[in-house]
Amino acid sequence: MTLRLSRRAYAEMFGPTTGDRVRLADTELLIEIERDFTTYGEEVKFGGGKVIRDGMGQSQRVAADVPDTIITNAVILDHWGIVKADIAIKHGRIAAIGKAGNPDIQPGVTIAIGAATEVIAGEGLIVTAGGIDTHIHFISPQQIDEALASGVTTMLGGGTGPATGTNATTCTPGPWHMERMLQAADGWPINLGFLGKGNASLPQPLVEQIAAGAIGLKLHEDWGTTPAAIDNCLSVADDTDTQVAIHTDTLNEGGFVESTVAAFKGRTIHTYHTEGAGGGHAPDILKVCGESNVLPSSTNPTRPYTINTLDEHLDMLMVCHHLDPSIAEDLAFAESRIRRETIAAEDILHDLGALSMLSSDSQAMGRVGEVIIRTWQTAHKMKVQRGALPEDNTRNDNFRAKRYVAKYTINPALTHGIAHEVGSIEPGKWADLVLWEPAFFGIKPSMILKGGMIAMAQMGDPNASIPTPQPVHYREMFATRGGALARTSLTFVSQMAADAGIAERYGLAKRIVPVRNCRNVTKADMIHNAWRPSISVDPETYDVIADGQLLTCEPATVLPMAQRYFLF
């Protein structure tokens, strides 16, 4: 007998299906389900009187033949699509995306459920890949809790704690500090990778940091980012298949942006805060967005451009770069970096896919828990101010959503050589997954999985009779305890360090994963974010011209995903 359900009734029971639309939080962004992998009438759902019971939706297969965990009827939002599916997890990895159930009695089943299978109800939830923040100043370990609670599951950067050097630069300098930080990484339920200090004009001081475990090198103007240092650093990176991140020369002491681009010599490099407020050739570092070898990112304080953006930046910059407001030269240095015109253009360059990534700059002119929020606030602002993208239609913002989710998932993974493990929801990848209620999308995840195990979740009073009574807040779960921690998170290192046996030498508990293919990636590989405009910045007015068009927009006076969701 066939029972017909209204779309509303179906969505309330099994989640939205093909053609249904979902609003992302309180934004103007709507996504539409492009495909439903489940079979109508054969959906699986757990609970009293529901489908996943012995002999019904649960088969008799043994553990080897079934997933460890199934997320049922979830909406997947990833760079490759927006679909409804069941997600299978096995041995800490995504095993399949498809239709779960009992193949002995149900048609179209691609994922068998058994007695060894745990169930996470994904009905009505959105699942994204764990976020990747590639601009971390490791100033305080407490950042990790904030990042994880926001949906970030991988942190890449440098530092040694609240040292003056780390407060300003994302570098873990030298083999001794690298070893200590890699040992510290064993204590945190998040994937970590560290950048060494790249500012040297001879190879050996850099090579020894790569050999000690650095996944790449960071060039920072506060250490002297001269053309000679850039050239040497990129040569070492080419020899070791590691990435280089750069904060260029704001003062133009060692040369102008053209000098820096010339020092690149066509070699791949990740440019941090490419707009320039976070640092870089004033006023025209944005020009590098047009280079095929440059992988450009933003940091989140300028995202998106609002009526408050300029006011907060000056004081923030003075503190982060150890400047003295009573010294005229220090004040001029700070003021040269804060330009409303380039910040406004940054919004549009993100929307058009010229800026490929977004990161935090944690505690050093950036907020570690707001990468995802500010990404989607930027997308919303651009939808309101610029309308639908040409690739989208009047019904949905699917392409825009794919473009923006790629900025903090797959593109950072490709840039830093870790896309073979993380960065997207695809079979074979590490099961770092974030579950969201649509009303709280991008703001407050319901649950964060690390390596297939629940690491953090919104949880009520532990003494209550059920999980939901107040106070509900983020609490660490079992993936963060004991030996499970080391088996559900990864530490990224260089291939050179892995081959040298640092895991045994340092006594590391976490699995180490070498980065790879860092030197082959180009701007063309930045998914949905590969536009290479010819950019000029007027040295007097700071107006930004891209392919002959002036890029400007008004500051936002109000934003979604803000005070509606937070008390403070």
Curated annotation (Swiss-Prot):
Its cofactor is Ni cation. Gene3D superfamilies: Metal-dependent hydrolases (3.20.20.140), Urease, subunit C, domain 1 (2.30.40.10). It comes from the Bacteria. Ni(2+) 1 binds at H135, H137, K218, D361. Residues 130-568 form the Urease domain. One of its GO terms (molecular function) is nickel cation binding. Ni(2+) 2 binds at K218, H247, H273. The active site is at H321. Binds 2 nickel ions per subunit. The keyword Iron-sulfur does not apply. Its EC number is 3.5.1.5. Keywords: Cytoplasm, Hydrolase, Metal-binding, Nickel. Substrate binds at H220. SUPFAM superfamilies: Composite domain of metallo-dependent hydrolases, Metallo-dependent hydrolases. Carboxylation allows a single lysine to coordinate two nickel ions. It is found in: Cytoplasm. The modification N6-carboxylysine is found at K218. It is an enzyme of class 3 (hydrolase). It catalyses: urea + 2 H2O + H(+) = hydrogencarbonate + 2 NH4(+). GO terms for biological process: urea catabolic process. Heterotrimer of UreA (gamma), UreB (beta) and UreC (alpha) subunits. Three heterotrimers associate to form the active enzyme. Belongs to the metallo-dependent hydrolases superfamily. Urease alpha subunit family. This is Urease subunit alpha.
